[in-house]
Amino acid sequence: GISDADKLLEEQGIIFARGINAAKLIWVLFISSLIGDIVETIYVLIVGHELMRRSSFVLGPFSLVWGLGAVILTLALSKVKRQNNLSIFISGFFFGGVFEYLCSVFTEVFFGMKFWDYSYMPFNIDGRTNLLFMFFWGIVALVWFRFIYPPLSKTIEKIPPVTGTVLAFIITAFFICNGIVTSMVMIRTTGRKEQPVARNVIEQFIDDEYPNDVVRKLWSNMDFLEE
């Protein structure tokens, strides 16, 4: 079984997901998405006194912006992680601004939805990001490489090899399926204004299970750009 295979590989000194590779990044995506969603939810509860769902997906408490941010941050800044703190901060500052800007453009172009708008804040860039949050991205990069990623990486490497690989495939399949369903719900939601009557079984299912009021509860901070 899987446990026997794990024992055999561990006896041979094989470590799961050593270094930076696909398996480790999948686990980083999963853990960061989950923790990011929890952190955002707590932050909004404390600052806005509101219990707001912050998940990017239809299913589960996963913030894809945090997850992808952690993965891309790890890949993009892996060369500077051993440099001084200022270099890491500056790299994270610019990386975060570009990443947040592109995420905003992507959701608007492909889904017709706006999940955040910083137009009311000073030093914003097209309302998609601003200097304050870019500063936070710099801090996040510094904290990530100095305090979070090293112990997280070691923890992931302690997962039994076969178990870790099997779970990585399951996580990947779940995120892909969840992403497809979420995308279909978003596209149907923005297209419902021009085409209120479902044209096929899939659209009918989405209309039945995810009408506008349900979508509003899923993403209460979202703006429908077509409205």
State the predicted function of each range.
Residues G1-E227:
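Aromatic-rich, lipid-facing transmembrane alpha helices and their immediate juxtamembrane interface loops
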